[in-house]
Amino acid sequence: MGNCCGNPSSATNQSKQGKPKNKNNPFYSNEYATTDRSGAGFKLSVLKDPTGHDISLQYDLGREVGRGEFGITYLCTDKETGEKYACKSISKKKLRTAVDIEDVRREVEIMKHMPKHPNVVSLKDSFEDDDAVHIVMELCEGGELFDRIVARGHYTERAAAAVMKTIVEVVQICHKQGVMHRDLKPENFLFANKKETSALKAIDFGLSVFFKPGEQFNEIVGSPYYMAPEVLRRNYGPEIDVWSAGVILYILLCGVPPFWAETEQGVAQAIIRSVIDFKRDPWPRVSDSAKDLVRKMLEPDPKKRLTAAQVLEHTWILNAKKAPNVSLGETVKARLKQFSVMNKLKKRALRVIAEHLSVEEAAGIKEAFEMMDVNKRGKINLEELKYGLQKAGQQIADTDLQILMEATDVDGDGTLNYSEFVAVSVHLKKMANDEHLHKAFNFFDQNQSGYIEIDELREALNDELDNTSSEEVIAAIMQDVDTDKDGRISYEEFVAMMKAGTDWRKASRQYSRERFNSLSLKLMRDGSLQLEGET
């Protein structure tokens, strides 16, 4: 459910402005009033067994340290002990579908269920009032995994082995507890503090689920680069976490993802083909043992893929302290930096898009549903959807509409209820035009010159960067995005950056789910999802 921990740069910026005022609960306002579909107020209950109702009795909320699709994370202080924690406050107004509500509920249940572990962020308390859910957890202020690697002067295979051992130990403890993570990626690992010996911690269980041995899942979730082929085939189990860890290992060793393309469909097809490139620099210098582990973690057949326990027994991990201590080269560090930096800029832009759409998406959806639901059954069929969209001036091909209907019809009854219709509406709004990208661009282009200049970039990313490397990072972004080298970023260059590699549409998790469901159906129909040897 987004970054639960602090960005250390925020603390630096705040200290310049004086001591922040504590706020008991930022969600007590009309802006967050919750209404049902008829417009009347009602109390939505999200958590099964919260610690309490009023967080302000036990904690003081301080400055904002992070922001995600659904919530804002604050530094918070235990009034009794003075201990510092992170508090993720999720507005109920943002939880528009049953899926959103279930995600939050399950995230808290999983965090409660997980045993204390040095590499897993721990839950302290949870609160629920009429307007929001508040999740109080361990505070991590040591920064992101890739940022620390880049900051170190010497990056080696031995360092990568130590990181991978930690990540796979997290996977192992999750699987032992009957939890499938489903969203392992570098951004979901933070260091507890700035010390060199700081523990690396898994921070986000927003897409995680409980599973039983042999149980298979079909919901497409996660981030495109890290998705296992069986996720796209919509038939998977906990083996997907080992695949995702294998993708991270590949990136740790060479600085780029193993399966990359300009479009989401291209990424999906590269994942299905599962061809691993060991020719580019620095792979010729990487040990055979490391390459062997990468191959076995990125085995396309989940039955043949190593388990987390088997990864930890692999010679490269067992002998992590003896792994080559020779630098992997400046190229790998530069790639990792670029990967991390571009994620920061995209995250900032996605946040602008998400904040804009959060208001826009809700407008008119209820009225549109009621207009299409002519029989007042509380659900609409394909013909009603098609007729309603045509009436609204949306011309969608029958085949695309059928795919969209199948992707969003969660209960499989051939109709869409209101919750499912919300997902369709969000999907269609984002497909219709690039208005949201224009709005994000305009957010950065503060003087409305038609270009993002270096000062505007610096201002927009102020909260994302620490003072020690900010100028270097800004220069790196400009170098990558400014393709015509005129010292500024045009709208066309901005759009190209947003659409490359990761899908900008992930501004909405619900949309991302439906988008990849739709893509999966297309790939099934054209035969792309068949395993080798299948007919």
From Swiss-Prot:
Keywords: ATP-binding, Calcium, Cell membrane, Kinase, Lipoprotein, Membrane, Metal-binding, Myristate, Nucleotide-binding, Phosphoprotein, Repeat, Serine/threonine-protein kinase, Transferase. The active site is at residue 183. Residues 360-395, 396-431, 432-467, 468-504 form the EF-hand domain. Residues 59-317 form the Protein kinase domain. It comes from the Eukaryota. Residues 1-29 are annotated as: Disordered. Its EC number is 2.7.11.1. One of its GO terms (cellular component) is plasma membrane. Ca(2+) 3 binds at residues 445, 447, 449, 451, 456. Ca(2+) 1 binds at residues 373, 375, 379, 384. There are 3 contiguous domains conserved in the CDPK subfamily: a kinase domain, an autoinhibitory (junction) domain and a calmodulin-like domain. The autoinhibitory domain (323-353) inactivates kinase activity under calcium-free conditions. May play a role in signal transduction pathways that involve calcium as a second messenger. This is Calcium-dependent protein kinase 7. The lineage of its organism: Eukaryota, Viridiplantae, Streptophyta, Embryophyta, Tracheophyta. The gene is CPK7.
